[in-house]
Amino acid sequence: MDVQYRPDQIEAQAQQYWDDNQSFKVTEDASKEKFYCLSMFPYPSGRLHMGHVRNYSIGDVVSRYQRMLGKNVLQPMGWDAFGLPAENAAIKNKVAPAKWTFENIDYMRGQLQRLGFGYDWGRELATCTPEYYRWEQWFFTKLYEKGLVYRKMSTVNWDPVDQTVLANEQVIDGRGWRSGALVEQKEIPQWFIKITDYADELLNDLDQLDGWPEQVKTMQRNWIGRSEGVELDFPIEGEESLRVYTTRPDTLMGVSYVAVAAGHPLAQKAAAANHEVADFIKECQNTKTAEADMATMEKKGIYTGLTATHPISGEAVPVWIANFVLMGYGTGAVMAVPAHDQRDFEFAQKYGLPINQVIEPANGEPIDLALEAFTGKGTLIHSGEFDGLSSAEAFNAIANWLSERSLGEKKVNYRLRDWGVSRQRYWGTPIPMVETEDGTLHPTPEDQLPVALPTDVEMDGVTSPIKADPEWAKTTFNGQPALRETDTFDTFMESSWYYARYCSPQSDTAMLDPAATNYWLPVDQYIGGIEHAILHLLYSRFFHKLLRDTGLVNCDEPFKQLLCQGMVLKDGAKMSKSKGNTVDPQQMIEEYGADTVRLFMMFAAPPEQSLEWNDAGVEGAFRFIKRLWRLVAEHVEAGNTGTLDVNALDDAGKALRRKTHETIQKVSDDYGRRNTFNTAIAAVMELINEVSKFDAATDNALAVKQEALEAAVLLLAPIIPHAGHSLWQALGHDEAVIDASWPSVDESALVKDSIELVVQVNGKVRAKLNVPANADKASVESLAMDEPNVKKFTEGKTVRKVIVVPGKLVNIVAN
């Protein structure tokens, strides 16, 4: 065995062995317990970054550990390959998005292989291939047939430079997040999937997800936003009644105005007759629309000239247009109670509208409505027949009053909106719908799928090539001329079901092969960043339930356990090209080897926490592997070891063996239960320290050292698999470490012959005492009293009491 650690050679040999033996190729095996470990697949941007390396290192460690436990482990990899960056790169580099994407995939695949990740590459998929997206198109047509898909006109944030629709969160200070252009509001027909039909199930099933971080579940609960309230009508003379939704019907008697969104039909009608209203609406359309911004932005409004009638009191209530009311939430109209809602309060103060208190604190505490709204619950006042009721009692009483008169009804509302899946981009999955000349919409027939995206295109940066080419859209439906939909799917569609396709990626007769899918699913461990807590993880859960209800999967949830790894930081900030603080994984691998990079990634922080990149830490990881290598080389050089005779061990041998099995016990818990790989590595480092100090002068001592080194190699094999491969062979094993079992704890090795006790006199430590582990209290007491330092501090005193706490301490009370 070469005494020098040469990572480039060692890693090439291990990877060659895995390739030759197809070590990570798996098939269904009913006789074995399965474990499906999945890390979120990357966008093929061109190069891996350290965030990828961390994510995939964690997944690989979990996968290799579970394999050593004897499980049938699936760990696949693929590419989330559609999306805007490919279009931008195509324009910049004058190359078709498909060519750019596949070149990036080839390069990044090589990087992943160089890191030694144990993927079943036979299952590799790229979402931009027709073999993949044809099934997404097929599934969409099935959802359409089931009534879960519809098209409607929808107001969108339109980026005039990028020529695309932006999500609310992509509008920053009224400008497109990427182009910086002023965003416009535009109405276009868009396709939606009815995620709201599943809102209750998506909410309730979060309670089943015991293996998910509480933070992620809370974020999803808030996003779904279930609320119970009342929907009621404010009549308007000569107009349709204005319908509003409120979660606080107890405050209804305090309404002093109603407010509608700029896009509300009443607002549009008012704008047609009043240019000031029209100008205000235009201004609203160019301000921030992300919900989070609503709380902090300046409240602005304009009076429409219309007056509504309060449904209970009959009083006149002015109708305003307000920039804080969103058309996308509720009915696009709100009843405003300035005394009991801070946003309504700020608006009322600005425009001199009445602030009518109708709730007082139940404890009678005074409130100052000149300063702020009182938003708590309490007892009703100034509310006619409802005076004296608590807020909870008034909720039902007012709801019933309205219901009896057909003026309102109780209603459950959701913050969640149906999923708009249309994108006006080229590089995405074509939406498989056609429109015949009579305006009827039809799903593309199955025998015409996939609707393939042309890949040999030139990008002009303005119009999608499939929109620019009128010939592409021309097709027939039942022999009649028809036009294809030229929008493409939101790329969250592809990532919402890829985990299921990995179970049978080669299937060309079905979206999912039932036997394979129901063997592997659900995913046992999913790993990815918390930035995906809402959209990707919610859409995947939704898609899974759609797959279940179409008979394609038989479980309710896609991911049993979720681990959200922390970011990789440098100089205290997230690595980014703009900050100039990135570290190229490729450079690190070439300098130190993949195992060192993996070891550093797993040692520097627990997986859920942010990791601070530290060159000295990488150097330290490299030194540790070299040290382990040298220890094994020296041990092998010392000659063959015989069989370990545990009964013939001296105290030093027993101590090393105890340390070995304590380490196995701790590391097994760190890997299996806690996911704290950093403390697992620290424990193995401690064991290696003990091994290096151990004097193996006899055959039996060499044998106990062999056991310790074997344990260290096995415990680190999931983290440094290449070095583990060579070291395991060097230690005399014919089987590869990839096929070795996880070491088991010998409980008898943990039993101590003697234990150390602290001896206190009057509560102060005066001695430490080694006693036989099985010594009785009387013996311990006698040994403690014989300690010279104890004698010194009890001399001339009367010993009143001796307290023996077994296995811990002796406390002598003397005065």
Swiss-Prot record:
One Gene Ontology cellular component term attached to this UniProt record is: cytosol
Entry keywords, A to Z: Aminoacyl-tRNA synthetase, ATP-binding, Cytoplasm, Ligase, Nucleotide-binding, Protein biosynthesis
Q: Name its GO BP terms in alphabetical order.
A: leucyl-tRNA aminoacylation
Residues annotated to bind ATP: K577
Q: Specify whether RNA-binding is a keyword of the entry.
A: no
Gene3D superfamilies xref list: 3.10.20.590, HUPs, Isoleucyl-tRNA Synthetase, Domain 1
Compartments, as annotated in UniProt:
Cytoplasm
What domain of life does the native source organism fall in? Bacteria
Transmembrane stretches in the record are none
Query: Does this entry carry the keyword Cell membrane?
Result: no
- What family does the database annotate? Belongs to the class-I aminoacyl-tRNA synthetase family.
Motif 'KMSKS' region: which residue numbers? 574-578
Question: Which reactions fall under this protein's catalytic activity?
Answer: tRNA(Leu) + L-leucine + ATP = L-leucyl-tRNA(Leu) + AMP + diphosphate
Q: What Enzyme Commission number does this protein have?
A: 6.1.1.4
Provide an example Pfam family for this protein.
Answer: tRNA-synt_1
Task: Tell me the classification of the organism that encodes this protein.
Answer: Bacteria, Pseudomonadati, Pseudomonadota, Gammaproteobacteria, Oceanospirillales
For this chain the motif 'HIGH' region maps to 42-52
Q: Name one GO molecular function term.
A: aminoacyl-tRNA deacylase activity
| Name of the protein in question | Leucine--tRNA ligase
Annotated InterPro entries: aa-tRNA-synth_I_CS, aa-tRNA-synth_Ia, Leu-tRNA-ligase, Leu_tRNA-synth_edit, M/V/L/I-tRNA-synth_anticd-bd, Methionyl/Leucyl_tRNA_Synth, Rossmann-like_a/b/a_fold, tRNAsynth_Ia_anticodon-bd
Q: Which HAMAP family match?
A: Leu_tRNA_synth_B
This chain's source organism reads: Alcanivorax borkumensis (strain ATCC 700651 / DSM 11573 / NCIMB 13689 / SK2)
